[in-house]
Amino acid sequence: MPVYMVYVCHGVSDRVQLEKYWASIEPTLEGQPLKLLAAYTPFEVLEGGDVLGVFIGEWPSMEAAKAWYDSSGYKAIRHLRQDNARYTGVLVEAGVAPPEERLRNRIYQ
């Protein structure tokens, strides 16, 4: 089942270091089954705020996405993003959950 990786940037403390992250990420993705859907393209915030940029990618499975995220190549550079910018990152399975199953086993019960 396809999985979407969504990262929303909420703030940047050191752009130079974040640019090092962006420059270093491509080699970690070589040979990976990631389909880039949107990466820091123009956007419009409909609700909420504090959005500086958005990344959306499609992976063939949750396992494939997690394997890349936990790979030694990505582990070696992800601190450049984590230490120098504030992001929310999620993996979302494709599909639509029925209303009665939405938010089950989550903190919002």
What kind of region is each of these model predictions?
Residues I77-V90:
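C-terminal structural segments of small proteins and small subunits
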Residues M1-G53, P60-D70, E93-Q109:
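Short S/T/G/P-rich N-terminal loop/turn motif that feeds into the first structured element of a domain
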